[in-house]
Design a protein with these regions (language model features):
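Class I S-adenosyl-L-methionine-dependent methyltransferase catalytic core
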Residues: 1-148
Length: 148
């Protein structure tokens, strides 16, 4: 598994706990994984599945890059705000690259930048999130399910 926006390693560490072999990189060195690696400049994917929580402003670019450099059948999972489904700019992308599955969290999640939950305002920041899962080459209907 390649985790190309590993940050402080929260997602990578959990996957390793689950017995997965994970290659963790990030553009910025935050003390975990290999820093200074610009995923958007990658020309190949030697690690297999891509699983990450990409920077939201360039999430589409992350997905497009992962699909571009991965082999047919490779799975790509991105932790994204549910609102990622919205937008005229992304509509053609979803039409041409339908996710195989979208796993929606049934409860809103609090997500803290760099794992710093003390920075969350008292009124919270609970937002609807989902795991969007692509399989390179898949052209069928997207299945939506819920994570409790």
């Amino acid at each position: 598994i390649w985790e190309p926006a590993c940050g402080m390693g929260h997602l990578s560490k959990r996957m390793i706990e689950l017995g997965k072999k994970v290659h963790s990189t990030d553009l910025i060195n935050r003390g975990y994984g290999t820093g200074g690696v610009d995923f958007l400049k990658a020309t190949e994917n030697p690690y297999g599945a891509v699983i990450t929580n990409p920077p939201y402003k360039i999430a589409l670019e992350f997905i497009e890059k992962a699909l571009d450099i991965s082999d047919e059948g490779t799975r790509i999972a991105m932790f994204l705000k549910l609102t990622f489904l919205e937008g005229k700019r992304r509509k053609p992308f979803f039409r041409d690259n339908p996710p195989r599955k979208i796993h929606v969290f049934s409860s809103r999640a609090s997500v803290a930048k760099d794992g710093d939950f003390t920075a969350i305002p008292n009124n919270g920041n609970a937002i609807a999130y989902a795991w969007f899962v692509w399989e390179k080459g898949y052209k069928g209907e997207t299945v939506v399910d819920w994570i409790n």
